[in-house]
Every structure is written in C-alpha cells, then in structure tokens.
C-alpha cells in the first residue's frame, strides 16, 4: 500500500513533518484540528512537500529522519536547495575519539 511523507507549513511558519497512507484525509484531519495537538494549536496553512513511498514504514523512517533536522535544513528541503542540504549536513562521526 502506498504511503506518503509530507511537510506542512503551520500558521506560525514552522515546518511540520508527518507520514500517512491517505494524504488527502490526513490534510483534512490537520486542518480540522483532529490530527494532533501541534496542528490543533498551530493550524497548517499549506502542504509544502510530499514524497511517495511503497510502504508506511518507509514513509515513517523518512519522517523520523527529517524530524531530527534543523529548521534551516527542512527549509532547504522544501525549497529544493540541494546545495544547502549538503552544506547543512552534520557529521556525527567523531573519528573514533569519543571517550579518549
């Protein structure tokens, strides 16, 4: 069953990532304040990005990945700024020196 990763722009300007198997219904749920507390308190104004996946678990993995990103990196993804995405990537490899 196909699934989607999506990003909403909220009224405050914040980008909100999510995943669903029914993009149209999830959008309606967010707009009506029935999807989650975040969008109930800060309603969405636009669906700014969506990516289709073969399974819901793949879409959820993408959601988890993007939720860890900085606001600047999410903005780069939404705007299609691939150069900035690369520049904003942070290496978590400490060269094996952790704890030394």
Q: What is each model feature region?
A:
Residues 37, 64-77:
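Short arginine-rich
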Residues 1-50, 57-64, 82-100:
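GIY-YIG nuclease catalytic motif and its immediate N-terminal context
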